[in-house]
């Protein structure tokens, strides 16, 4: 699991991701990539998608993420040079090597989100909709 330091997860997010990974990998007979965030910016364009049933959430096929995602060792090894290029070359956007991987591998995100990217609310990424993020923030207090 690759996670950036500005994400807050629902308490059961990891359970949801692991059960969903197992379920959908079995369904498609292949490895995949899960992003825990339903980014609002991905709804700017209309495009066809596929919807999958996870443990407790529906998940939809997406073609872009930031740098927080869950995948398998097999996917990392298969696309190692693309992952490595993120550290050795300047890409714009930074995540473009990931987007290239998603042309070959299934990448999905939950509807609604199970994690929030704590970015500026006015940024292109925005806050994932249909969640009480204040409640989730409070539940994550240490």
Predicted regions mapped to residue ranges:
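A broadly tuned preference for mixed-charge, low-complexity surface segments
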Residues: 4, 54-61, 118-128
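C-terminal catalytic/acceptor-binding lobe
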Residues: 73-74, 78-142
């Amino acid at each position: 699991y690759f996670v950036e330091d500005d994400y807050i997860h629902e308490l059961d997010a990891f359970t949801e991701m692991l059960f969903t990974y197992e379920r959908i990998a079995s369904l498609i007979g292949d490895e995949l990539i899960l992003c825990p965030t339903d980014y609002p910016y991905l709804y700017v364009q209309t495009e066809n998608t596929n919807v999958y049933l996870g443990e407790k959430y529906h998940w939809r096929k997406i073609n872009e993420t930031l740098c927080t995602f869950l995948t398998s060792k097999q996917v990392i090894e298969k696309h190692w040079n693309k992952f490595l290029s993120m550290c050795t070359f300047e890409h714009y956007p930074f995540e473009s090597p990931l987007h290239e991987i998603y042309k070959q591998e299934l990448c999905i995100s939950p509807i609604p989100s199970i994690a929030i990217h704590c970015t500026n609310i006015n940024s292109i990424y925005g806050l994932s909709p249909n969640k009480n993020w204040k409640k989730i923030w409070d539940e994550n207090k240490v």
